Structure formats: structure tokens, C-alpha cells
Amino acid sequence: MNYVQSLCEESELGIPVVFSMDSVIGASWINDTTILPDAITLGATGDAELVQELADIQRQEMKALGVRMSLSPNADLATDPRWGRNQETYGEDADTAKAMVVAAITGLQNGTDGIGVDSVMSCVKHFPGSGPQTGGVDGSPLVFDDETFALHLSIFEAALTVHPASIMPYGYSTVPYLGGDAVENYAHESSVVMNDVLRGRLGYDGIIQTDWGLNHIVAMQAGADVMGGMGQRDVTRMVDQVDPSLLTDRCRRLLLAKFRLGVFENPYTDADEIAQVVGSEEHYQKAMEAAEKAVTLVKYENQQPLEGQQILVVGALAKNVDALSSGWKISSETGLKTEGKSIYDAICKRAGADNVTYIGEDETLIADSYPAGTTAIVVVGEASGTHEPAWGTATLEFPAEQQNLLKKLDASGVNVVAVVLMNRAYVMTPVDAASDAVMIVYRPGVTAGAEAVAHALFGDCAISGKLPWQIPATMDQVMLQREDLPKDIENPLYDYGFGIEVAAFGQ
């Protein structure tokens, strides 16, 4: 970062760079940072104050590292359970989303009055609300009527009360409801979306940041200021083809933001500050607190303390560190430090390795019966992802391999505790039927999530999380619900806001 800033300082105009990061879960593309629980996990806490505290942690770490813009928070609503990006939302309730989006912006920007020298710029996305994808398929046209458009838009209206530095229209969907160029153009290339609605109807005068993969010239002419994914060749072509008055207008907004951030005075990072702030123990503990508070019990029958029991840990996801967070991070394949961070590792640490047996996904290793005082902790759900969910958008049903493990364990008579890594609202009926207890942990975070899960299982913390969305009983229910309408599944298996509270698991 400092090297790039030094090159800028030596250039003719000396204009510093503002680095941005797709940091929806902390400064997560850099190792040794605090990777926070995903937004849907925080939605289950119902705690906007906690969201602000976590956003402030992200601000501290990003600022220390020299990254002064975060492409977060996500102000979308999870109104269709099939959509793969539901994990980035705070759930399907508009009031919860408003409170948490406002809290996240406030934490990132260090206040409610816009950006200053201690801020990280917040880029709220994806305008005008990208939750209602046709059929739940990412990149399909957005579905609205008058009532639901106002509902989804209301999250952004709430966000504007605390003056986010930037707004990002969605780059992969059209908005036919709005008419005009929004019928054919993606939202970040649409004048109707950016000028008529965002600047006109909502009165927004800040920076419009595009998504990635676009026609940069069309986007700028339509109203965008910052072009996502633009390379040097694109810049040269744009300068040659765009009206200079447009460039002047866009540069004015960007320079004003840089002056407010104070990067003209000091664009450099400090190694001592990085060592003190990034990945600190204090930040670890706060991330763990959030993951613990989100844990949601939806079934809880005849449980005894796990202390002293023989523990079977079942399922490949129990050793999959990446699955503890969404895909918006450095991965184990690209350098993520994973040692000691899986759910299996955390259970071994808490119970003692001699009391734990790992079965993985080989159901032939499951015995016909087990001694009394044995519990199987079965970790199920989807692997980590970003836009496209691991199971695809056509189904929310657990794969046969995971269902068979649960059924065979249930038949053995062992106590079965299902731990569900949940990035979407799955069809939970087979898990409920084969388990004595069902604990949903969402995406608890690579940094502290595994330890938080172990704490919840062994009664080291209270369990109080509430579902941030409805849980369907069947795929037929999913197919009958509307993409744009929240809480419209009739007779769900578990309803929005449900969660069994216990002072300690097993007691």
C-alpha cells in the first residue's frame, strides 16, 4: 500500500489512491485479520449495537491496513430462499435490516455525519434491492410490484439517514418494473435506476460505485462515478469517448471524498499500528461473542451435558474451515491459515481428543449401536460460496449423503445433534426428523466461529438466537412463495423469529 501511495505522491498531481475491498465480513482478503460472522449470522442476534461494534472493528483493521473503502454493508432482503447471496443479508425482515444496515454504516464511517479522517467509506449495496431475483437465480431480472419495490427501497432510504459515502447498484440484474433503460440495462448501467430513483427520488448526492463486469462507458454516461473492475485500457478508452464535463463531475465527487478522508495529508500505513490493531485478541473475543449470540436452537429434546461423553463428529464440513464463512475472503487454497480452526478441532480442544471420534462422510463407519453416553455431532449444510450456492438454486434440500448419515445414526439409537451451517433457508424436514437437537449456526466466521460452536455445544454460553427467515418444510412451499415478498411461506417448518432459548445446552 505504501509503495503505491509513494508513486502517487511523486506523480504530477500527487493524488493519493483510495483502496477498496469487497469486505462484507471484515478485512477478509488479507491474512491474520479478524474475519467476522456473515451478515445473516448477525441477523439472528437481533442486536444492532453489536453490528455497529463489529463494523467498528472492521474500520479499525481496514484503516490500519490502508484500505479506506469497504464494499459493504448489503442492504438486500432475503425474500427468496433460493438466492445464493442471502448469507450477505440480515434476513427477510425490513425493520431488522434497516437497523443493522444503519449500524454497519455508522461503525464503518465512525459516526452518522458522513466520512472523516477516521472513517472507512461505506458502499451500501445492491441498489435498489437485489434480493428478489427471478426464480432465485442470481443475475436474473428483479421482481417487484409497487408495494414490494417500496419495501426493498426502504432499506436504502434508512441507510441514507447516516450518509454512506457510496451506493452500488446491482451489476447483474435488470429492473423491468422501473421501465425505460432499466428494462434492458443492468442496474449499474441504467439512468432510470441511478438518476431517476437514486438521485431523483431519494435525493442521494454521494458516490455511485458500479459492480463488476460492465460496459464502463455506458455506466458513466448513465450516472456512475466509480467503475468496478476497470483496468488501464478501459480508462484510456473512456477518456477518449466520454464528455469531459462528465469526467469533471465524477472527479469532483471522488476528490471531495479523498479530502474528507484526510488521505492527501497522510496516505501511509504504520507497521506498529497494524501489529497492534489487526487480528487482536479483543477483536477475536467480540467476533466469538457475535457467533455465540447467533446460535439458534430449533429442536431440543432430552439433552444432557456433553462433558464426559464420548463424541462422534460426523460430516466433512466438520473439518472444512472455509465453510465457516462465505466465499468473500482469502481461502485455504489461497493462503488462509486454517490450523486449529475447524469445528472438529474446537470440539477436540473442548472435550479432549481422546473422547472424540471423527467419522467424516463414510456411513459404513457408523456402528449399529453405541454405548449410553455417546452423542453424534453431525455438521451439515453447504460449502462456502459467493454468487452461486453449492447445491445450485433448483433445490434447498440436503444432499442424499448428508441425509443418509443422519438416518443411519438415528437408527443406531445414538443421541444426534445436528449442527447446521446455513447460508440459505434450507428444507429442514429430514434433519428435524433424524435429530434429537438441531442447532443452526449460519456462517459463524473463520476466525472465532468454530470455538463459538463448541462453546454452545458444551454449555459454555447461553443460546438465544432467533431465525432471521422462515424455514420451509418442503420445496413445494418454496416454489409457491413470491420472490419479492417476505414471510409468505404458509405453514413453514419453523417460522421467522423462532428459536428455543436455553441458559446452557444440556441443562
Regions found by a protein language model. Name each.
Residues 1-507:
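Glycoside hydrolase catalytic-domain context in secreted enzymes
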